[in-house]
Amino acid sequence: MEDVAGRLPGHGLYVLPTMDRIGRLLKKNGDTANLDGVVQRCGIALSRRFLDGLGLAKRAGVVRRGLREAEALLQAGHKPLLILAANIATHSRQKFEGVVHRYAVDEWVELLDSVRLGAACGWSESVVLAVNDPGLERRLRVDAFRWQTFHRKVDA
């Protein structure tokens, strides 16, 4: 069973799922036939959890869309979570990096594509989003970290 929220009862240990760890576990148990299905289910569940959190933030009214609105939050002294679509254009990435450098933002998340990020908020494509609520920001950071960890290739 996939526990993407990290809430199942246990002994206080939560192992971050990665494709490699899941593969090793299934090979160890002799169940390699299910590998693709389990990996796909985990990837979908992690994406869905992040996008659900983003939709929740939108309904709470704490999501800003676009580089200008994100920069306005930074200029006002806020420290929002900046979310960048993985399919951002080179020119837009350069603008984003300029803003990040100007306001000394040391951390942002880059994942999924602009269509999925926008759809989670009920918009068309959205390349840059800013979430300005500490609680939702924390949840989205954790979910983004789990998503990125899952999709990272690990050699061991």
Predicted features along the sequence, with ranges:
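N-terminal cysteine/histidine-rich coordination modules
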Residues: 1-31
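Short basic, glycine-rich beta-strand/loop surfaces that mediate nucleic-acid
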Residues: 2, 8-9, 103-148
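Positively charged, polar, low-complexity stretches
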Residues: 6, 23, 40, 67-71, ...
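Extended interfacial segments that mediate partner engagement and assembly in macromolecular machines
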Residues: 20-84, 90
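Short glycine-/acidic-enriched loop or helix-start segments at secondary-structure transitions
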Residues: 25-26, 93-94, 140
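Short, glycine/charged-enriched secondary-structure capping and boundary segments
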Residues: 29-30, 96-99, 123-124
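Structural motif
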Residues: 85-87, 132-133
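N-terminal targeting/trafficking signals and adjacent low-complexity tails
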Residues: 102, 152-156
